Amino acid sequence: MMGWRTVIVNTHSKLSYKNNHLIFKDASRTELIHLSEVDILLLETTDIVLSTMLIKRLVDENILVIFCDDKRLPTAYLMPYYGRHDSSLQLSRQIAWNEDVKAEIWTTIIAQKILNQAFYLGSCGFLEKSQSVIDLYHGLNLFDPSNREGHAARIYFNTLFGNDFSREQDSDINAALDYGYTLILSMFAREIVLSGCMTQFGLKHANQFNQFNLASDIMEPFRPIIDRIVYENRNSSFVKIKRELFTIFSDTFHYNGKDMYLSNIISDYTKKVIQALNQPEKGVPEFRI
């Protein structure tokens, strides 16, 4: 059973293991948390000492561990070599995925993202811009040769953050977007490994320097979750926005007819996308914001 707690450590401390518990110890206190309760461990500072036994047990329990750099930005995460007993079998399937099937599934996933962007613009009152994005959605073709995804993103971000906004800018807005996307990317990467696949082999993403091409492909419909939080806090500092981004771990979202935690949604969504790649008749699940 998956844990439900997100543990954030942001002070000088030592983390160790004893009797199925994570032991947190700093200068003033000691706390114990049973590993079965933990879903995500976010280490926000470099001033933390971990025992190797704890690291081993975190891997055993499939707990997502995210490491931050000296600027408190996500820089790495802990990933096991093998996520399941038949990883070699699933890897052979992944390598043999049909290109036409990959195109169909990638395009379906991107269509969901574009629709979610349009719906969010509409919910913010930008009805004309929302319709423009929907028009781009209706013209989407396999693997998007006309880059309608890019055109939709330009309308979307310029509407939310101004015509002068660019994703290449050095700003608190972009820092917050990147921070939030990295949190979601890490969650998808964990589920991909647990499904027996390699994160490097994507559907369309094929950047040789990107270790998470497949996660980057599958996570696309979920990006507007981060966009909403950043937009609603766009006049706040990066530190304040970052704190609000942590609510993705505790909030529930509607999926498959019920309200669920994001980690559970991502787990189910990833499994079903990979099932659809292995068996195309299964179809891609739908996620709507």
Predicted regions and their residues:
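N- or domain-start disorder-to-order transition segments that initiate the globular core
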Residues: 1-33
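Active-site helix-to-loop segments that bind/position phosphate- or nucleotide-bearing substrates
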Residues: 3-6, 10-13, 60, 72-289
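Short low-complexity stretches enriched in small and charged residues
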Residues: 18-25, 64, 139-141, 173-174
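A broad, structure-centric signal for solvent-exposed, well-ordered loop/edge residues
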Residues: 24, 31, 40-42, 50, ...
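A short alpha-helix capping/helix-coil boundary motif
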Residues: 32-35, 166-168
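A diffuse structural propensity rather than consistent per-protein peaks
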Residues: 34, 51, 238-242
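Glycine/small-residue-rich interface belts in oligomeric ring/scaffold proteins
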Residues: 35-86
